[in-house]
Amino acid sequence: MKKILIANRGAAAARILRAVKALGLQSVAVYSEADADLPYVLQADESYCIGPAPARASYLNQDLLLEVMARCGADALHPGYGFLSENAQFARRVEAAGHCFIGPSSRWIDVLGNKASARELMQRHGLQAGGSTGILPRDDMVAVRQAADALGYPVLIKPAGGGGGIGMIPVHDPQSLSDCWKRASGMAEKAFANAALYLERFVPSPRHIEFQFLADRFGNVLSLFERDCSTQRRYQKVIEEAPAPAIDRQAVAGMAERLSAILGKIGYDVIGTVEMLYTPDSGFSFLEVNTRLQVEHAISEAVTGVDIVQAQIRLAAGEKLSSVIDRPPAVAGHAIEARLYAEDPVRFLPSPGVLKAFELPPPRPGLRIETGYARGNRVSSHYDPMVAKVIAHADDRAAAIRELTGALGAMRIEGIKTNIPMILQVLASERFQAGAMTVDGLQAVISTESVKELA
């Protein structure tokens, strides 16, 4: 592996570029017309425009990405997260062209990247999972209604081929099912070029706990412990932390060990995250497997000292796990990540625009900021509104909260609105401080008037 094409944008592309350079490999960036002036485009060894702003014409354009790979002589492709990262057809095409797809083998994306088949496989291996359907016919509302009635309301509509909360819509009554189904299908098609949907029984007030794994192609699996991603808005993660606070450590360790055994038994490879729902009464329930790098990987890197992106690249290239990570990792301290979105913090509407000011605290021990933007860049309405990730790492959770709060308060961002006021209010809330957030708990700790004052 000598040259890697980075098939992504924004903070994901910037992070992968840093790992590629650290490994001494050549880098190729691709960009849409809307992203031509983003910093990483200029920092890569080579850069190629792949079309107009809409994702379907650029970052989801499989033919054009493969054409650029052939033209520039890249021998590997890193898909990042989102876009085509869990598209098994694209992974197969990359492999068939003689290139390395830097992720799990396409067969695992086929089986586990598809949320419905992943549940079936994990249930066969003994994991508890809430009620769900298989993939349902897109245009057969009679079948969809029958499936929803069988599960019992409320239900959750979920895309089978994507993640990040995009296209996930709770439905509380039969009357709204049809409209929600059409809306979710359109969102999934636009974001992932895959409109397939299924239904899941809605679980009230769970915590979202996920387990990070690395694996080689020789049957070895390594757990990088867990993350708590319970602070969400509309099923999109806002704040993540590692390790999970205020939880039964024995139960967490037992689940990590059990998942490692399952992944090793089936021969899973390279990188993956197993997402679970957790309630004190019911314990862990399987949710899905993300067959890709996660947005929130940085908090696991902070507490373990493992560079997950470099490890992913080396494992995809065929190295053994023991040569990539030479000693068993342990958790050191506590890390918290906040996702900064270009959105109105009161009404939660997108806030695209030009970054007239983008002043971030300089990196220092205990503080890391990931972004794909700089002052003067335009935050486009065509893509996910995340403009930066801010990661604080300290000896304990209270110190990490203070570090993150201070960093967010020191930022000066003008030209767009951001969710910083909302994040600050969450960090200061009694519920967050107690480690008691659930996936539906964000609204309970947000005061519109207080957010207005902070904004």
Language-model region placement:
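A short, GP-enriched loop/loop-strand-helix hinge that lies immediately N-terminal to
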Residues: 6-7, 20-58, 68-114, 128-135
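Short small-residue beta-strand/loop micro-motif enriched in glycine and branched aliphatics
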Residues: 130, 165-167, 294-299
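Short acidic/polar active-site loop segments enriched in Thr and Asp
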Residues: 2, 75, 153, 269
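Residues within well-ordered alpha-helices
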Residues: 16, 37, 65, 90, ...
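A conserved helix-loop-beta module that forms one wall/lid of the active-site cleft
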Residues: 95, 99-160, 167
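ATP-dependent carboxylate activation and anion-phosphoryl transfer catalytic cores
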Residues: 5-15, 19-29, 33, 47, ...
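Short amphipathic alpha-helix with an adjacent loop that forms part of the alpha/beta core around
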Residues: 57-70, 144-150
